[in-house]
């Protein structure tokens, strides 16, 4: 049985070509391994940088930030995924990827972080990248780390 998902999607960006709520829901659900209550918020650079500075003590604009709340109820994972629209747009352009593919990747990447995946060392990065690629393949999206 698929994990239960309670999802809120917030658009706080002036970008034109944002994914739909339905697309975001599909990407989140595909990456989910546990019942969860998640907010995905798409923001502009100022908000992403302010959050990165306030919560990670890093003064740059990230592509995605994840705020894990752990179990907010028995067996219910909680957290926020914040995606910076201008950075995702720039990276997609620089990498020659369709914008929707890169939004899917950043969404999946953030949801995996909520579930404990990371890329601190090579073994963890390989595990996370393999999982990302398998999820994205379901949407006919090529491996995000291979050209």
UniProtKB/Swiss-Prot annotation:
InterPro entries: MetalPrtase_cat_dom_sf_prd, YbeY, YbeY_CS
Cell compartments where the protein resides: Cytoplasm
Cofactor: Zn(2+)
Keyword terms: Cytoplasm, Endonuclease, Hydrolase, Metal-binding, Nuclease, Ribosome biogenesis, rRNA processing, Zinc
EC number(s) per entry: 3.1.-.-
GO BP annotations listed: rRNA processing
SUPFAM superfamilies hit by this protein: Metalloproteases ('zincins'), catalytic domain
PANTHER family: ENDORIBONUCLEASE YBEY, CHLOROPLASTIC
Family in the record: Belongs to the endoribonuclease YbeY family.
NCBIfam families attached to this UniProt entry: rRNA maturation RNase YbeY
Described function: Single strand-specific metallo-endoribonuclease involved in late-stage 70S ribosome quality control and in maturation of the 3' terminus of the 16S rRNA.
Name of the protein described by the UniProt record: Endoribonuclease YbeY
Organism from which the protein derives: Thiobacillus denitrificans (strain ATCC 25259 / T1)
UniProt lineage: Bacteria, Pseudomonadati, Pseudomonadota, Betaproteobacteria, Nitrosomonadales
Gene transcribed to yield this protein: ybeY
